[in-house]
Amino acid sequence: MTTKKRECFLSTPLQAVSSLLQVPGVGPVTLERLTQAGISTPQQLVGQFMVLNRSTVAMVSWLKHACSVGGREANIVAEALFAKTERMGVL
């Protein structure tokens, strides 16, 4: 299922994504937990995904353990980041 939020996130250049709330799967609670883990921008979140070698499994695990993000939300975030980096041409 593709949501409007996902479509917007994927079609917007990363530099123009100004809030973590624009990332699919990120709501107010997840935003607070990411901020507590030192992630305050969408660019930092993509950077963390890149550090984890663009592995959705590793990203889900990191979100669950480092940020206490629920499994459903973690999967949505990881899949959106994978799709975003694919569109950016990152190998």
Locate each region found by the language model.
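C-terminal extensions
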Residues: 1-91
